[in-house]
Every structure is written in C-alpha cells, then in structure tokens.
Amino acid sequence: MKLLIVDDQSTVVQGLLHCTNWAAMGFTVVDTALNAVDAKASLLRQEAEVMLCDIEMPMESGLDLLDWLRQRGMTTRCIFLTAHAEFRYAQEALRLGGFDYIMQPAPYEQV
C-alpha cells in the first residue's frame, strides 16, 4: 500500500520514516510533506492509499486536508497523529471519514 506521511515537524517525519519498518507491514512510503499544501501537491501527482497525518499544522490542518481529499472524491484512508486530546478533533476526524486517531507521543510500534 502507498503511504504519505504529513507532519509539520521534520523530526517526526524522519522518525516515522526511519524507525518504522513500513515494508514489513506492506507499505511503501511514496512521499512525505511538512504541510497540507505540499501534501496536496503530492496527492495530485500520486494518490496514496493511506495518509499518516498530523492534525495541527500551520496554515491548514490535517482535518482541512482530509476535507479537501473527500471533496475531490479521493479515497485515501487517513490516520491522524495528534498531541491534542480534545474530543472535538476526534469527532471531526471521524465525521470526515478518518480511519484512525493516534495520540502523540506514541511509540513507533504503536503507529
């Protein structure tokens, strides 16, 4: 499965890239993005089957990005990473069709 990793913190992106054995789980990381704008460009070039995405990012949130995906009929499954425990984030993620919701900090094994 094709995976896109989106997080505004480059250390999180690099950690996810290098500390998780994606191939063993059947994933190929096709791209990474540090914001929603770059993620959109990546998705327009090549739609990922799964997107691992931070919710709180500058300019546009991960929730905005998922809404953009759904408006275009894209079926990418979204797993949100967030440090925010507020129920409204989880509720909105589910309303938009989010696949899962992981609280940070999370061990790489949990991801």
Tell me what each language-model feature is.
Residues 29-30, 78:
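Hydrophobic/aromatic residues located in beta-strands of well-ordered beta-sheets
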Residues 40-41, 46-111:
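CheY-like receiver
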Residues 10-11, 37-38, 59:
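Cytosolic nucleotide-utilizing catalytic cores of signal-transduction proteins
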Residues 23-29:
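A generic structural motif
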Residues 30-37:
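Conserved Asp/Asn-Gly motif in the active-site loop of CheY-like receiver
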Residues 1-12, 16-17, 51:
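Conserved acidic segment of CheY-like receiver
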